């Protein structure tokens, strides 16, 4: 989260009103820009669960934003299957507590991304 303030979801859908120095404002700006420019679906994804209260708050914020903008979320943070892995799998799939290895992306995350994207599109 890089210590960027979380911010709050606004009532506006006007790009000029978003505080892009906050997580909420930056996400809302991206969604608004994509809607105005390309008029295509927007999909965000969350990281698999790790020990971070600030990231947990950001995931909650993203769900608030989802309600406002009707975007899609591939939510690994709250995905029991993704987060319920053995220590052996954790060593194979993660470089550290946050960043997946190549195997982590390919074997652990990719099947979830494929399934959700098929549901969405």
Predicted feature locations:
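Active-site segments of SGNH/GDSL-like serine hydrolases
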Residues: 1-5, 27-61
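Catalytic His-Asp segment of secreted/periplasmic serine-dependent ester chemistry enzymes
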Residues: 5, 49-121
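Residue-level detector of functional hotspots within protein domains
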Residues: 13, 28, 91
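Conserved acidic
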Residues: 15, 19-22, 54, 104-105
């Amino acid at each position: 989260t890089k210590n960027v303030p979380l911010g709050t979801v606004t009532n506006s859908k006007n790009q000029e009103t978003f505080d892009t120095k906050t997580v909420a404002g930056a996400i809302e700006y991206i969604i608004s820009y994509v809607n105005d420019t390309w008029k295509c679906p927007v999909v965000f994804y969350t990281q698999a669960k790790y020990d971070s209260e600030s990231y947990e708050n950001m995931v909650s914020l993203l769900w608030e934003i989802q309600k406002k903008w009707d975007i899609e979320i591939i939510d690994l943070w709250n995905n029991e299957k993704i987060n319920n892995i053995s220590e052996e799998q954790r060593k194979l799939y993660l470089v550290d507590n946050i960043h997946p290895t190549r195997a982590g992306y390919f074997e652990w995350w990719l099947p979830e991304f494929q399934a959700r994207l098929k549901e969405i599109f």
